[in-house]
Amino acid sequence: MPEQQYDTFSKFGKSFQEKLVKTILFDRNFANQMEEVLDTSYLELKYLQVFVDLLFQHKQSYPHPTYEAMVSVVRTQTEDYSDSIIKQVIEFMARIKSNAI
């Protein structure tokens, strides 16, 4: 029986995936479209999945978050995730802020 394959963005690499998530954060219209079609499991990296899940959850109750709002979300709503994942999310956000992505 052939192994079932799942589609992911892994073939596009880490840089592409991080830029995609950065665009979701900063472009509200794009984020609205992606929210309708993006299954976060397509993202290969767990910290990107967590970040996008947190962003989309925030959008359910509040307007599209700013970078600063996401800093607050990450500080207050990540208790269900491991310390290593939270650290990676924080490092990702630091790279966004420093324009390293």
Residue ranges of model-derived segments:
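Noncatalytic partner-interaction/assembly domains of nucleic-acid and motor enzyme complexes
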Residues: 1-101
